[in-house]
Regions:
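Active-site-proximal helix/loop segments of hydrolytic enzymes
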Residues: 2-4, 11-14, 21-127
Protein backbone atom coordinates (compact mmCIF):
# COMPACT_ATOMS: atom_id res chain seq x y z
CA UNK A 1 0.00 0.00 0.00
CA UNK A 2 1.49 3.40 -0.93
CA UNK A 3 2.26 5.89 1.81
CA UNK A 4 2.81 9.61 1.38
CA UNK A 5 4.05 12.40 3.60
CA UNK A 6 1.45 15.19 3.48
CA UNK A 7 3.04 18.55 4.27
CA UNK A 8 0.69 21.55 4.27
CA UNK A 9 2.24 24.95 4.97
CA UNK A 10 3.10 25.93 8.54
CA UNK A 11 3.33 29.65 7.67
CA UNK A 12 0.61 31.12 9.88
CA UNK A 13 2.12 34.62 9.47
CA UNK A 14 1.69 34.64 5.67
CA UNK A 15 -1.74 36.26 5.41
CA UNK A 16 -3.70 36.21 2.15
CA UNK A 17 -4.41 39.57 0.51
CA UNK A 18 -8.04 38.49 0.10
CA UNK A 19 -8.53 38.36 3.87
CA UNK A 20 -9.34 34.64 3.74
CA UNK A 21 -6.79 33.67 6.37
CA UNK A 22 -3.19 32.56 6.30
CA UNK A 23 -1.30 30.26 3.98
CA UNK A 24 -1.19 27.70 6.81
CA UNK A 25 -4.97 27.87 7.22
CA UNK A 26 -5.75 27.53 3.50
CA UNK A 27 -3.24 24.76 2.80
CA UNK A 28 -4.49 22.78 5.81
CA UNK A 29 -8.03 23.05 4.44
CA UNK A 30 -6.76 21.45 1.23
CA UNK A 31 -4.97 18.72 3.20
CA UNK A 32 -8.12 18.10 5.27
CA UNK A 33 -10.09 17.69 2.03
CA UNK A 34 -7.48 15.31 0.58
CA UNK A 35 -7.46 12.88 3.50
CA UNK A 36 -10.73 11.03 2.71
CA UNK A 37 -9.69 10.65 -0.95
CA UNK A 38 -6.33 9.21 0.05
CA UNK A 39 -7.91 6.73 2.45
CA UNK A 40 -10.67 5.69 0.05
CA UNK A 41 -8.00 4.93 -2.55
CA UNK A 42 -5.90 2.83 -0.20
CA UNK A 43 -3.20 5.44 0.29
CA UNK A 44 -1.77 5.77 3.78
CA UNK A 45 -0.31 9.08 4.88
CA UNK A 46 1.51 10.85 7.65
CA UNK A 47 0.95 14.56 8.06
CA UNK A 48 3.15 17.30 9.47
CA UNK A 49 1.93 19.39 12.40
CA UNK A 50 1.35 23.17 12.64
CA UNK A 51 4.20 23.65 15.13
CA UNK A 52 6.69 22.22 12.62
CA UNK A 53 8.71 24.16 10.06
CA UNK A 54 9.38 23.29 6.43
CA UNK A 55 12.81 22.03 7.50
CA UNK A 56 11.54 19.83 10.32
CA UNK A 57 8.81 18.45 8.04
CA UNK A 58 11.44 17.48 5.46
CA UNK A 59 13.68 15.93 8.14
CA UNK A 60 10.77 13.89 9.50
CA UNK A 61 9.83 12.73 5.99
CA UNK A 62 13.44 11.82 5.18
CA UNK A 63 13.66 9.74 8.36
CA UNK A 64 10.73 7.59 7.21
CA UNK A 65 9.94 5.43 4.22
CA UNK A 66 7.49 7.34 2.06
CA UNK A 67 6.63 6.80 -1.57
CA UNK A 68 5.82 10.46 -2.13
CA UNK A 69 6.25 13.83 -0.41
CA UNK A 70 3.35 16.21 -1.08
CA UNK A 71 4.03 19.79 0.01
CA UNK A 72 1.06 22.17 -0.15
CA UNK A 73 2.22 25.79 -0.26
CA UNK A 74 1.39 29.08 -1.91
CA UNK A 75 3.72 31.91 -2.86
CA UNK A 76 3.37 35.59 -2.08
CA UNK A 77 3.49 38.16 -4.86
CA UNK A 78 6.19 40.83 -4.87
CA UNK A 79 5.37 44.17 -3.29
CA UNK A 80 3.15 46.24 -5.56
CA UNK A 81 1.67 43.14 -7.24
CA UNK A 82 -0.39 41.77 -4.35
CA UNK A 83 -3.44 39.93 -5.64
CA UNK A 84 -2.18 40.01 -9.24
CA UNK A 85 0.00 36.89 -9.43
CA UNK A 86 -1.83 33.64 -10.13
CA UNK A 87 -0.97 30.13 -11.15
CA UNK A 88 0.01 26.69 -9.93
CA UNK A 89 3.41 25.00 -10.10
CA UNK A 90 3.77 21.29 -9.38
CA UNK A 91 7.41 20.80 -8.38
CA UNK A 92 9.37 17.57 -8.57
CA UNK A 93 12.91 16.45 -7.77
CA UNK A 94 15.23 16.88 -10.79
CA UNK A 95 15.99 13.56 -12.44
CA UNK A 96 13.13 11.74 -10.74
CA UNK A 97 11.12 10.17 -13.53
CA UNK A 98 8.39 9.08 -11.13
CA UNK A 99 8.37 12.50 -9.43
CA UNK A 100 8.02 14.24 -12.78
CA UNK A 101 5.21 11.88 -13.77
CA UNK A 102 3.40 12.56 -10.49
CA UNK A 103 3.80 16.33 -10.95
CA UNK A 104 2.42 16.09 -14.49
CA UNK A 105 -0.55 14.03 -13.28
CA UNK A 106 -1.30 16.60 -10.58
CA UNK A 107 -0.99 19.44 -13.10
CA UNK A 108 -3.25 17.66 -15.60
CA UNK A 109 -6.01 17.30 -13.00
CA UNK A 110 -5.54 20.84 -11.68
CA UNK A 111 -5.93 22.27 -15.20
CA UNK A 112 -9.44 20.81 -15.21
CA UNK A 113 -10.53 22.87 -12.20
CA UNK A 114 -8.25 25.93 -12.15
CA UNK A 115 -9.72 29.02 -13.87
CA UNK A 116 -6.44 29.73 -15.71
CA UNK A 117 -5.34 26.30 -16.98
CA UNK A 118 -2.50 27.79 -19.05
CA UNK A 119 -0.91 28.91 -15.75
CA UNK A 120 -0.64 25.38 -14.35
CA UNK A 121 2.93 24.16 -14.92
CA UNK A 122 5.50 21.68 -13.63
CA UNK A 123 9.09 22.45 -12.69
CA UNK A 124 12.07 20.58 -11.20
CA UNK A 125 13.54 22.01 -7.98
CA UNK A 126 15.64 21.14 -4.96
CA UNK A 127 14.69 24.15 -2.85
Amino acid sequence: MPIIYLSPSTQDWNMYVTGSGSEEYQMNLIADALEPYLLSNGIQYRRNRPEMTAGSSIREANSGYYDFYLALHSNAAPEGRYGEERGIIAFYYPGSVQGQRAAELFAEELREIYPLPNRVTTRPTTS
